[in-house]
Amino acid sequence: IDTPGTWGRDYTREVIENYRNMAGMWLVGEDMPQADNRVTLHDTEKDQYGLPVPVVHFDEHPNDLAMRNHAYRMGSAVYEAAGGSKSYELPPFPGTHNLGTCRMSGNADEGVCGPSGATHDIPNLFISDGSQFTTGAAENPTLTIVALPIRQP
């Protein structure tokens, strides 16, 4: 609704007074797959059970940034055409659907499992979550994730 970090009595008053004239737009696009994005295990840090904690490494692809900037421009144009007077470009939502850590591929050199989720190297082991997706679509992946194990032998 407003710039990040905005808070306090004046902000609250402005939001409440203008609430009936506010709108929000959520624009979602595909994150391009990158081989260097990964989840590894920390060398020394452990969780409460003594297991290594995960370390997520994620860099945005230049197309991701270009797509976001395009969405900001087009979203602002929609609001301006509707008579809006203010638009704010908020940072990306800090939540993700982690995908691609056990990528689906035609062979073991390029990924972990095949189209049915069966792993290339370990017989009768199936990947049944979003980690087999090579990339994410512009929609929430939950229904597709639920469908994956239904089609597994």
What are the residue ranges of the model-derived segments?
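Secondary-structure capping and boundary motifs in well-ordered enzyme cores
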Residues: 67, 96, 116-120, 129, ...
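Internal hydrophobic alpha-helix adjacent to the cofactor/substrate pocket in enzyme cavities
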Residues: 75-82, 148-153
